[in-house]
Amino acid sequence: MIKKIGVLTSGGDAPGMNAAIRGVVRTALSERLEVFGIYDGYLGLYENRMVQLDRYSVSDMINRGGTFLGSARFASFYQDKIRSIAVQNIKKRKIDALVVIGGDGSYIGAQKLTEMGIPCISIPGTIDNDVSGTDYTIGYFTALQTVVEAIDRLRDTSSSHQRISIVEVMGRHCGDLTLAAAIAGGCEFIVLPEIDYKKEDLVIEIQAGIAKGKKHAIVAITEYICDVEELAQYIEKKTNRETRATILGHIQRGGAPVVYDRILASRMGAYSVELLIKGYQGKCVGIQNEKMVFNDIKNALKNMKRTFKKDWLITAKKLY
């Protein structure tokens, strides 16, 4: 029977992480459990930087972006000797289980700790929406709103100058954020990691649009596919249309979480504690068809590639 739990946020921050921490803390306290917050993710676990949390520790946190516990990327945590020190720190505090909020890298750490005797439940927190076992991740909808607002602003200036604008969106190997933002923002062209990309083909599509009378256009592209500044120069040379690239960058991770992210994070935080109380470990929570679900972290990591929303792309192309 667990009496104390710890909670940490790891990897890239995402709007709604504070709401998830709040969900964990308030639910645990309602079940008469003690809760410890761990600063800066697995790094704080290794350095033994923890603090006991009460209900007031998470007051006025549901609407705040980022994570008040801090986060860090700590590659050394993959080393057995580093994790052993972290486990010792957990045991010194008599913490019985952990809730880990983050992306796939955080999942790996949680699985390793579970295998070392520390029960863990993971919550998907990343704007990339690239974690399997869930329809949506915490932070995705807020980032989507941010990207669409940026596209709206770019369209204002692009239309004024009859310009082609390229907007680079986060997502790593997953195009969910780019695709959804492109549909909502009315982008004329979409470049995703899930589909074959050739700059020559993109130019042909753009030229076809110009031939139809298109005076300006927005190209939405997921990060890491190509150098967008070089792409802008190439498009401008081939089309004789002024072309500019905008990299949205880390602004996509900031800001107060939108309503859906607050609700999702609160539900996932509460559900993770409920699973620990029932004796589950090595699980990751998710939402599917608006219902809370859980899967083995190990299975989620084996099947990390999400199903590509091909039907969304087909719809988007019809709307050009």
UniProtKB/Swiss-Prot annotation:
- Reactions mediated catalytically: beta-D-fructose 6-phosphate + ATP = beta-D-fructose 1,6-bisphosphate + ADP + H(+)
Binding residues for ATP: 12, 73-74, 103-106
Where does the chain bind substrate?
Answer: 126-128, 163, 170-172, 223, 244, 250-253
Q: Name one GO biological process term.
A: fructose 1,6-bisphosphate metabolic process
What is the regulatory mechanism acting on its activity?
Allosterically activated by ADP and other diphosphonucleosides, and allosterically inhibited by phosphoenolpyruvate.
Looking at the UniProt record for this protein, which Gene Ontology cellular component terms does it annotate, in alphabetical order? 6-phosphofructokinase complex
Q: Which family does it belong to?
A: Belongs to the phosphofructokinase type A (PFKA) family. ATP-dependent PFK group I subfamily. Prokaryotic clade 'B1' sub-subfamily.
Q: What is this protein called?
A: ATP-dependent 6-phosphofructokinase
What is the scientific name of the source organism?
Buchnera aphidicola subsp. Acyrthosiphon pisum (strain APS) (Acyrthosiphon pisum symbiotic bacterium)
